[in-house]
Amino acid sequence: MKKALLVVVLALFTLAVMPVVAQDQPFAGKKVVVVTQEGSAIGGPAEKYGAEWAAATGATVEVQRFAFADLYPKIITALQTGTGEFDVLIYASDWMGDIAGGGYVSPIPDDVKEAVEWDDILPLYRERIADWGGTTYAVPFDGDSHMMYYRKDLVNPNSPYAAEFKEKYGWDLDEPQTWTQYKQIAEFFQGREVDTAGVTAPISGVAEALRKKAQSFWFLMDRAAGYSKIPGNPYFFFDENMKPLVNNPGWVQGLQDWVDIYNCCAAPDMINFDVVNVRAVFPAGQSVFGLDWGDVGPITIDPNASVVQGLAGFGVTPGAEKYWDYTTGAWVDAEGGVNKAPFIAFGGWVISVAADSDVQDAAFDYVKYLSGKDLAGTLAVTGGTGVNPLRQSQFDNLDLWTGAGFDEESAKDYLDAIKATIDDPNAIVDLRIPGAFEYFDALDAGIAKAITGEADPQTALDEVVATWDAITDRLGRENQLTLYKQSLGVE
């Protein structure tokens, strides 16, 4: 009798527990395949926190990571051929035109927006970057824009070098506002022995990503922006008739500036740098300047990666004293002496679910987990994650940054530089139309020719324009123009 009673009790207990187990493991037996870039930046969090989500839900997560140069071809080939091999895509928002515009990803459901606290994401990212044709197809994972890093212990009016600098260049040594000033400071310090964390060693002027098939084209755009972005006019890559602007005198001057600074003031082997190198060289105290997304900031406070803790200054990228007005065919002196046009380069990494995924429910739940407000804050203040500030709460909560190791002054400086970039009325949003990858690949090739001396900047950019026109014609000029205007918010 006791045995029979025990069997009944165990059976009832099993029935009682089974729904709980099923509820706690809602995606048991389901596999979610994620595709993104290799390395600690972006790919690292996708894998680490994907494993946490899998343990909590019973699902299996496979994160496939590819070199950045290979990522777009891998994704677009899988989508266009209908292999169904990827469920979640973590990709450059520049590619939205091909990916969302091609109908390859699912709209973001309201429950996902609610779960990630959608309204906390800055309007730029939730309304423009995540949208295609009036529909939200992605969740912003990272807020990207370019910024300038500099050694504030060396570059300031009270610096030990200030008097010598002013005697040579005629202005007070301080955070540069123009590319001319940036070059003069870099030139002044190039090869000079300076003290960094108690060690005296020669320093380079600049560390920038110049390697072909990496991110060089985005850093050319930083320079071209000041010289060619007309205040109040949204057109930058193409004009209102889809004629490429990238070989006009403003763009040519930007490329010439880059050639000049490479020849005078570059860190050793900078021609082979991508952003990973910049994120090592500047925090190591080996350059006066660095250009990057927001990633360098948290690295500068990491005692395991940085010797410039408290010595790094953060600023909006420089502008130009004059800009080329393509509508009149003339140079214009900038109002106030500087035409600043900060660049929302890349626009950030976004997350979408493939329309042909057969595990949509699990895939969107993974997106919720990876894009949550609390995790976003943790990732933004952690060096090496590739995730930069994109939420209002991250700008409002200074304790988030001081708790991570920033001193209060540096935290404010860092956040102010990012916010000033995003909020600038003359800021440029990156190219997002179909073919963006191809357009940029052609520009990348032109930059390499100019930097190595194979062609002068004008000739190199003329060749780029010829290729851009061919891409536009192949994709359909009228349709490309319509989509380009839509991306700019122009009717």
What do the PLM-derived regions correspond to, one by one?
Residues 1-33, 55, 60, 462, ...:
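Short, low-complexity disordered leader/linker segments with a strong preference
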Residues 26-48, 66-69, 144, 434:
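Extracytoplasmic "Venus flytrap"
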Residues 55, 112-116, 130-218, 230-272, ...:
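Helix-loop-helix "hinge/cap" segment bordering the ligand-binding cleft or interdomain interface
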Residues 49, 216-233, 252-365:
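Extracytoplasmic/periplasmic substrate-binding proteins
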Residues 33, 48-124, 128-131, 135-138, ...:
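Extracytoplasmic "Venus flytrap"/periplasmic binding protein-like
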Residues 296-307, 320-445, 480-485, 491:
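C-terminal lobe and pocket-closing loops
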Residues 109-121, 163-174, 210, 227-253, ...:
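Short, solvent-exposed loop/beta-turn-alpha elements that line the ligand-binding surface or hinge
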Residues 24-26, 93-149, 156, 198-200, ...:
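Hinge/lid segment of periplasmic solute-binding proteins
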